[in-house]
From Swiss-Prot:
<feature type="signal peptide">
    <location>
        <begin position="1"/>
        <end position="35"/>
    </location>
</feature>
<dbReference type="GO" id="GO:0042752">
    <property type="term" value="P:regulation of circadian rhythm"/>
</dbReference>
<dbReference type="GO" id="GO:0016301">
    <property type="term" value="F:kinase activity"/>
</dbReference>
<comment type="subunit">
    <text>Heterotetramer of two catalytic alpha subunits and two regulatory beta subunits.</text>
</comment>
<feature type="glycosylation site" description="N-linked (GlcNAc...) asparagine">
    <location>
        <position position="188"/>
    </location>
</feature>
<keyword id="KW-0723">Serine/threonine-protein kinase</keyword>
<dbReference type="InterPro" id="IPR008271">
    <property type="entry name" value="Ser/Thr_kinase_AS"/>
</dbReference>
<dbReference type="Pfam" id="PF00069">
    <property type="entry name" value="Pkinase"/>
</dbReference>
<keyword id="KW-0732">Signal</keyword>
<feature type="binding site">
    <location>
        <position position="139"/>
    </location>
    <ligand>
        <name>ATP</name>
    </ligand>
</feature>
<keyword id="KW-0808">Transferase</keyword>
<keyword id="KW-0418">Kinase</keyword>
<feature type="binding site">
    <location>
        <begin position="116"/>
        <end position="124"/>
    </location>
    <ligand>
        <name>ATP</name>
    </ligand>
</feature>
<comment type="similarity">
    <text>Belongs to the protein kinase superfamily. Ser/Thr protein kinase family. CK2 subfamily.</text>
</comment>
<feature type="domain" description="Protein kinase">
    <location>
        <begin position="110"/>
        <end position="395"/>
    </location>
</feature>
<dbReference type="InterPro" id="IPR000719">
    <property type="entry name" value="Prot_kinase_dom"/>
</dbReference>
<dbReference type="GO" id="GO:0005730">
    <property type="term" value="C:nucleolus"/>
</dbReference>
Length: 409
């Protein structure tokens, strides 16, 4: 049938471009269904995919959406429950980072003092502003695509002044190598592996609440962080100051856009990333926050300790159960590859009480368990939003203290 249609249409389509587009569509229909090593899902034909690849994002034109699945049904796009249209309403120059013209500062204004860390995309140093003598953080970027650098700068500029968002002070580059560096405010943080075991029940409530302020703000500005983890949450415990840092993987949220699932650090990857669901949203950050919170209250870091991405899903399934995982997959018309399905196996849901012991019981209250349970959900649509999380009973003491403090000022 397809061959006959192809022959007839080829006779009538005299334009080479039209013939090429038709050929792509027919070949896609004739080809055997291609499967990811992890997941079998709906396949979108090449004609449906807009020619727009921005840092792993693919825009799908709904007017040309053709999906082929085992059930021959089209899966509706998943959209964020909150702040869905932020970047639809705002002018293009708010989120169009590829058009950003960087205003470079003077590199000679800053001197490196000592190395404080390194990541996949950068090396981080404590520095000093030679003019003001103030400490700063210098993030020297490794060679990456210019649009990725522009994206991080644009996002930091848009979030400037937001609660508990690290402040970008300057952007400079070496005159010879053209290597760019981002200059940030200095935060005198303690390594989380040293700090977390010393935190009280109230400390954890306080710092998670402060982190939620940062997340709700960035989400309200149409931005997903996509790499929430202890390494990226700087805490100056003496000043009780928290800053959410490293916005290198952050991205603007556009409803209907498919995003790269190769984001976030393994132990904090949401199930949506592990099953290759690309139309994820801000709720990814809430899963990562939940993993971080579980590690803090149960004193088990990391909480889900997978050896690779497939094993990460196995570790999650052993806690949340496979019946719930299958319900999630069915809802979004996804299917695990047989190899991964075999690895995951069958597991019943484990009650959170199983993780309570003599060392952590003083941190695990009923409201803490309820809060955690509403974050660590397979279905990203069922997780608390950052604003909903801030209203949870777990933070009643923190909200009361904040209200009292504001009244006394």
């Amino acid at each position: 049938m397809i061959d006959t249609l192809f022959f007839l249409f080829f006779l009538f389509f005299d334009s080479p471009l039209r013939r090429l587009l038709l050929l792509c569509a027919v070949l896609a229909l004739r080809a055997p269904t291609a499967h990811s090593p992890i997941l079998r899902s709906s396949i979108v034909t090449p004609t449906a995919r807009a020619v727009s690849e921005v840092s792993g994002c693919t825009t799908i034109d709904p007017d040309f959406l053709v999906e082929i699945s085992d059930s021959n049904q089209t899966r509706a796009m998943s959209k964020a429950r909150v702040y869905t249209e932020v970047n639809v309403i705002r002018p293009k120059d708010y989120w169009d980072y590829e058009s950003l013209i960087v205003q470079w500062g003077e590199q000679d204004d800053y001197e490196v003092v000592r190395k404080v860390g390194r990541g996949k995309y950068s090396e981080v140093f404590e520095g000093i502003n030679v003019n003001s003598k103030e400490k700063c953080i210098i993030k020297i970027l490794k060679p990456v695509k210019k649009k990725k650098i522009r994206r991080e700068i644009k996002i930091l500029q848009n979030l400037c002044g937001g609660p508990n968002i690290v402040k970008l002070l300057d952007v400079v580059r070496d005159q010879h190598s053209k290597t760019p560096s981002l200059i940030f405010e200095y935060v005198n943080s303690t390594d989380f592996k040293v700090l977390y075991p010393t935190l009280t029940d109230y400390d954890i409530r306080y710092y998670i609440y402060e982190l939620l302020k940062a997340l709700d703000f960035c989400h309200s500005q149409g931005i997903m962080h996509r790499d929430v983890k202890p390494h990226n949450v700087m805490i100056d415990h003496e000043l009780r100051k928290l800053r959410l840092i490293d916005w290198g993987l952050a991205e603007f949220y556009h409803p209907g856009k498919e995003y790269n699932v190769r984001v976030a650090s393994r132990y904090f990857k949401g199930p949506e990333l592990l099953v290759d669901l690309q139309d994820y949203d801000y709720s990814l950050d809430m899963w990562s926050l939940g993993c971080m919170f579980a590690g803090m209250i149960f004193r088990k870091e990391p909480f889900f300790y997978g050896h690779d991405n497939q094993d990460q899903l196995v570790k999650i399934a052993k806690v949340l159960g496979t019946d719930e995982l299958n319900a999630y997959l069915n809802k979004y018309q996804l299917e695990l590859d047989p190899q991964l399905e075999a690895l995951v196996g069958r597991h019943s849901r484990k009650p959170w009480s199983k993780f309570i012991n003599a060392d952590n019981q003083h941190l695990v209250s009923p409201e803490a368990i309820d809060f955690l349970d509403k974050l660590l959900r397979y279905d990203h649509q069922d997780r608390l939003t950052a604003k909903e999380a801030m209203a949870h009973a777990y933070f009643a003491q923190v909200r009361a203290a904040e209200t009292s403090r504001m009244r006394s000022q």
